[in-house]
Swiss-Prot record:
BP terms from Gene Ontology: formation of cytoplasmic translation initiation complex; translational initiation
PANTHER family: EUKARYOTIC TRANSLATION INITATION FACTOR 3, SUBUNIT 8 EIF3S8 -RELATED, EUKARYOTIC TRANSLATION INITIATION FACTOR 3 SUBUNIT C-RELATED
Oligomer and partners: Component of the eukaryotic translation initiation factor 3 (eIF-3) complex.
UniProt protein name: Eukaryotic translation initiation factor 3 subunit C
Biased composition (Acidic residues): 55-76
GO molecular function per UniProt: RNA binding; translation initiation factor activity; translation initiation factor binding
PROSITE patterns per UniProt: PCI (PS50250)
Similarity comment: family membership: Belongs to the eIF-3 subunit C family.
InterPro entries: EIF3C (IPR027516), EIF3C_N_dom (IPR008905), PCI_dom (IPR000717), WH-like_DNA-bd_sf (IPR036388), WH_DNA-bd_sf (IPR036390)
Cellular component terms (Gene Ontology): eukaryotic 43S preinitiation complex; eukaryotic 48S preinitiation complex; eukaryotic translation initiation factor 3 complex; eukaryotic translation initiation factor 3 complex, eIF3e; eukaryotic translation initiation factor 3 complex, eIF3m
Amino acid sequence: MSFFAKLQGSDSESSSGSESEESILSGSEGERQDKKLAAQKKQQKSKASMFLNSEESESEEESSDEDEEEMSDSDDERQAVANKFLNDAASSDEESEEEDKIIVLSAKDKRFAEMEAAIHSIQNAVKNTDWVLASSELDKLFRFIARHLVTIVASPIPAEGHIPPRFLETLVSLEADVAKTLAAEKSAPKKMAPAKAKAVNGIRQTLKKKSKEFDGVLKTYNEDPEAYTAAYEKANAAPAAPKPKKAAVTTPGEGEDDEFMTIGKGGKTLNLTADGVFKTLREIFEARGRKNTDRAETIKILTKLLEVSETTYQKIRVLLALVPARLDYSQHLVSIPQESWVTALQEFDQLISILIAEPDYLVQETVGEYDDLVERTPEVVDGKKQKVLIAGSLISLLESLDSELTKTLQHTDAHEKGDEYIDRLKHEAPLYTTIVKAQTLFEREQLSDNIARTVIRRLEHIYAKPDIIIEHFESKATQAAAGLKSEITPFDVKRDASGVIHDLAVFIYQSDAPVLRARAILYHIFNQALHGRYHQARDLLLMSHLQDTISHADVTTQILYNRAVMQVGLAAFRLGFIPECQTILSEMFSTLRQKELLAQSVQRYNIQLSPEQELLEKRRLLPFHMHLNVELLEAAYLTSCMLVEIPLLASVDTEEQRRRVTSKTFKRLLDMADRQAFMGPPENTRDHIIKASQALQAGEWEKARDLIVSIKVWSLLDNAAEVKDILAKKIQEEGLRTSLFTYAAYYDSLSLSHLASTFNLPVGRITSIISRMIYTDELAASLDQIDGVVIFHRVEQSEVQRLAQQLAERTASMLEQNEKTLDVKLGNQGQGQDRDTRAVGGEGGRQQGERRGGRGTYRGRGGRGGRGGFNQGLGTTMGRRVTAQ
């Protein structure tokens, strides 16, 4: 005897023991009556368990030995007799036994078994006044119905077969029980326990809330429960026998179609034909966004609908649903799979092509109400053909496609997965072509806002690219848009890459959106600077006044501003405008956040970011192919600092003036190098520039030139050879200026020809540089062009004079200190002639202090202690001495 048979036997024994006092039929007549009752019970059970269809497991459950089957049959007969007297208890036991057998059959049967179990638990809990249990079981019941609606919404079953009658019956009865309990509670002498009272109120609120959701169905059920149950059974009778459908799958020519038509394990099919397109679309729209919705299955259904669509209206409707479905493939992935994105781009391009070819159909975000289950065609009203307006947003789909490509590139490591990154980057050209086609469509329909948003996307793709790539993009777009018209960029007019960007940017300047205007001018500035047009880029930046308002702009616009400014500084460096380059780049390199400010990495080590903030920071990062080379920018900045700051450091007289150097970053690097006892050969770009700066300070301009020219990062510039020539020439000139500032104090005059041979510059250039230094008061000298010399004017102390004056000052200070120390040691307070002498000496000391404190230079910086002060002090001292005698 099997385990289940033993359990049934024990149940039979217990039930027979409990029925010992009842009168039971016996003999042949009793046996016939037992069989008749058992048959009736089985028929009732088959009707009651309509939701627990278990035909698939009958052979498995009844394939055991003969004895077990006979035993279970006899148990059923005895229980059928007992049902005459103990209907509720025995039937619940039998249902639980059959549920134990059926619960593993299929997902559908398991869901309905859960519903039956929840309903049974609610009924028992209400009888036992266990409202806490009833509340939890009610939540389970509502979760069941939510899952049930998600799975049945895509089936061909009509609406009257969606909500089970048992569910509605439970809601109605439970609402009545709750109302009865609350009414009894008001007059009861003893109040209900707080937990139960809270549960009852919770059930009442839940029922009140859910009744609004099922208002129509509940109303129909309350009018005639039997009619509703009959309609439900009739609606669900069709898929009751799935075996013929399984056989139909193997028929020739239908196997492939059935693979798309079958949904779930219940054998329910969709009407994937031209006639059922709109109904299926509505069901998909209703199911979208709900929990446990199978997105892959939705995409498969929509793809099949696109294949069977016949009319233009059907294709547009299906494509408007299919493209967002692919873009919303998974909310847990950082970006959609590349294959899904490519397919979505192709389908969106197909949608744009259909709308271009069919001008009678227009997709807009705001349209009037219309029946989405009816085919629509253009109508003639008052002799004019009216367009068919379809609800949708083409510009949102286009921006989503563009953003998804950016996400894909952001999360692809260009170093470790370079080939994959390049493969994904190749799809930018087809996307650009689609953007151009969408722009022509929006221009034809005169959708100004959509045109501006499309043009700014088009600018974003080409503003930072070389001309050859832009020309390739434009040629592909022109071929795809053959026969189309565009007023912004006419396809029949040939223009270079800069002309295309100029036309697009000028169009955005006329837009009403300030954010788009700001970004367009930044794109334009960046492109002008990229081509080395420094003055045009600078003028655009100054005329835009963005530097005054950029702190109030959004983060994306600030990033674009930083990129544009860096490119302008690099353009100035490429043309040899060294002071301008240093001024432009100084603000960026005064911090240690260059890559963060350029949206190329996240470097906030000392700032704690929440996961949401960190995610936002990563989303703002630019793809690798749009990064600016920070090493190149740093090389340009430090080289500019070297050419500007080294002559300035040589011209200052005091340490205080040295601390007023413009670039503190460069000064710090130079001081660190000076403090090192030994500095090895340069290893990186920064080392090359620092060693070149030290060589330039020492007058070794040739060594400095070789170090700067040997920097490898210059090869990234388009005009690398020209830039190296400019730098070599600048180093020669600044080397001359540094030498004049450093050694002018040691010479009375210098030959111009000697300077020309030393610095390998023409005499005319030497004369020009010295003349400019004299004119700006940087150098106190004059030019004697007859003798070809520069004569230095001794308007300041020579080196020997300066050292002699320092020695005299220190000697006088030491003498005064020794005299004070001697007076303290001897305790001599000064009496008689010695006191007068000390007083005279003190007066003379004050005068000497004035002379020492007020010394000046030969430029006339002296105060009271000049030559006149010395004579005055000496005369006073001598006069007092004579008086004392």
